[in-house]
Swiss-Prot record:
Residue span of region G1: 19-26
Subunit annotation: Monomer.
Taxonomy of the source species: Bacteria, Pseudomonadati, Spirochaetota, Spirochaetia, Spirochaetales
Region annotation (G4) ranges: 137-140
Record region (G3): 82-85
Gene that this sequence comes from: tuf
UniProt keyword terms in alphabetical order: Cytoplasm, Elongation factor, GTP-binding, Hydrolase, Magnesium, Metal-binding, Nucleotide-binding, Protein biosynthesis
Region annotated G5, chain positions: 173-175
Function in brief: GTP hydrolase that promotes the GTP-dependent binding of aminoacyl-tRNA to the A-site of ribosomes during protein biosynthesis.
Organism this protein belongs to: Borrelia turicatae (strain 91E135)
Family designation: Belongs to the TRAFAC class translation factor GTPase superfamily. Classic translation factor GTPase family. EF-Tu/EF-1A subfamily.
Membrane spanning residue stretches: none
UniProt name for this protein: Elongation factor Tu
Length: 394
């Protein structure tokens, strides 16, 4: 069957659901998908099972990798990332967050904010998301007096992490909306959420004029066609027939893009902000991996050593309880990759939780790197610092 061509009739935005495990992120994503398929006859409804689609996730009932679905409202075309909330899988949340322009933070009304609520807010802020909407879920299970307290608590938390104090809160039951798609009362919260998204989120400024760059999130082999790399276009534009370079982790190599697709539809060209699959000529599945970047030729180079400014989280923010010294070896998360690196402190003996400090880092493998790129620092399954590259040393 021939694939249809993607029609760019509405502005495109990447939005995601974030929040603590079991607060209802995937249920909300499914409820939105089902609601939009009722309103817009062309849309395909995805049930909870379709979004949580790895066997291990079904068994544990949690989302591991970020999942993508698409839907349209009156004014926008959304690509929606369902981000994992489970602690071990927060690294996938980082790559999910790196693809989002705005986020919906889920908080269960019956339990309030939890540790991962804070970690996700911090990561969202570090990944450059500047507006969120709070969805207060499981309203049917919560004591009405408690709900007011949870609202106040969540807004305080949202402000603490640098988001606006007038961040909108939508209340409802995602499970109710998902289970009763034909009941207007049950789906009212979804309608309200989508209207709030259309009106409150700012359309991001896309870097279309800069040289093309996409961070590889996943790689597939399609029989008879070749290798497809997927990810979000960070900047620039890509067309079929364009020559590109695959940079980072391994030797840099050149290839030609022979196809561009988004949500199984053919794109005339992919542009900044699009989540796409690129078909690459003469590249074997084993020759390319998550964490590399595909870029316009000669526009980005791989490096190991850089100087950065970092902020170390306090114990209360879920960071380290003790200082670290030169020789500290945590994981550094850039775009879609994590690499171990060694920290050197200059003119300072140690770094305390809560400090803002400049450090020098040497990674164990080269990755595609440019100035001002932000990263997260993690150890033992938690985020301990966030930073930005000041200069590349070698």
């Amino acid at each position: 069957m021939a694939k249809e061509v993607f029609q760019r009739t509405k502005p495109h935005m990447n939005v995601g659901t974030i929040g603590h495990v079991d607060h209802g992120k995937t249920t909300l994503t499914a409820a939105i998908s089902i609601y939009c398929s009722k309103v817009n006859k062309d849309a395909k409804a995805l049930k909870y099972e379709d979004i949580d689609n790895a066997p291990e996730e079904k068994a544990r009932g949690i989302t591991i990798n970020a999942r993508h679905i698409e839907y349209e409202t009156a004014g926008m075309h959304y690509a929606h990332v369902d981000c994992p909330g489970h602690a071990d899988y927060i690294k996938n949340m980082i790559t999910g967050a790196a693809q989002m322009d705005a986020a919906v933070l889920l908080v269960a009304a019956d339990s309030g904010a939890e540790p991962q609520t804070k970690e996700h807010l911090l990561l969202a802020q570090r990944m450059g998301i500047n507006k969120i909407i709070v969805f207060l879920n499981k309203l049917d299970l919560a004591d009405p007096e408690l709900v007011e307290l949870v609202e106040v608590e969540v807004l305080e938390l949202v402000e603490k992490y640098g988001f606006p104090g007038d961040t909108p809160i939508v209340k409802g039951s995602a499970f109710g909306a998902m289970s009763n798609p034909d009941d207007p009362e049950a789906t009212k919260c979804i309608k309200e959420l989508l209207e709030t998204m259309d009106n409150y989120f700012d359309l991001p400024q896309r870097d279309i004029d800069k040289p093309f760059l996409l961070a590889v999130e996943d790689v597939f082999s399609i029989s008879g066609r070749g290798t497809v790399a997927t990810g979000r276009i960070e900047r620039g534009v890509i067309k079929v027939g364009q020559e590109v370079e695959i940079v980072g982790i391994r030797e840099t190599r050149k290839t030609t893009v022979t196809g561009v697709e988004m949500f199984q539809k053919i794109l005339e060209q992919g542009q900044a902000g699009d989540n796409v699959g690129l078909l690459l000529r003469g590249v074997d599945k084993k020759d390319i991996e998550r964490g590399q970047v595909i870029a316009a030729i000669g526009t980005i180079t791989p490096h190991k050593k850089f100087k950065a400014s970092i902020y170390c989280l306090t114990k209360e923010e879920g960071g380290r309880h003790k200082p670290f010294f030169s020789g500290y070896r945590p994981q550094f998360f850039f775009r879609t990759t994590d690499v171990t690196g060694m920290v050197s402190l200059e003119g300072k003996e140690m770094v305390m939780p809560g400090d803002n400090v400049d450090i020098v880092v040497e990674l164990i493998s080269s990755i595609a790197m440019d100035k001002n790129v932000e990263f997260a620092v993690r150890e033992g399954g938690r985020t301990v610092a966030s930073g930005r590259i000041l200069e590349i040393l070698e």
